[in-house]
A protein has these predicted regions:
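A SIS-like phosphosugar-recognition module
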Residues: 1-136
Length: 136
């Protein structure tokens, strides 16, 4: 899990994620009413209007999904697209929305574990580490 706000995000890992040849999955999480002008990526920031932030999150999501037009001549301007990214948009970060996110990730862990034939409720790896530690 990592993240950043503003131009630091744009010019570091967002560019790497968009143009990387590596495959990844990711989640974009947007809280539109917890805006702080100190960390805003827009020059004409309006604290009372969260439309710009929502539109920016949607545009990043679509860029990951669709990529750029394949007719672009320069290779370094091409963005591949077809990257599996989910977009979660919330009005505010509070106890309820944080609980929703935790529930989503717990369900995702359980679902993926069932496909890998793993019981996510046992701790054999943890117990093995404890046994090895006792023998050192």
């Amino acid at each position: 899990i990592f993240g950043e706000v503003g131009t630091d995000a744009q010019h570091s890992f967002f560019q790497a994620l968009h143009q990387s040849t590596l495959s990844f999955t990711g989640d974009l999480i947007c809280f539109s009413n917890n805006l702080n002008s100190e960390f805003c990526i827009f020059d004409d920031y309006d604290k009372n209007n969260s439309r710009d932030l929502k539109n920016f999150a949607i545009s990043q999501y679509l860029a990951f999904k669709n990529g750029s037009d394949k007719s672009i001549e320069s290779v370094h301007h091409h963005v591949k697209g077809n990257k599996p990214v989910d977009l979660f948009m919330f009005n505010t970060l509070n106890e309820y929305t944080l609980g929703q996110l935790l529930c989503i990730y717990e369900y995702k862990t359980l679902f993926e574990a069932s496909f890998a034939d793993i019981n996510p409720f046992d701790q054999y790896g943890v117990e093995l580490g404890k046994q090895i530690f006792k023998n050192l």
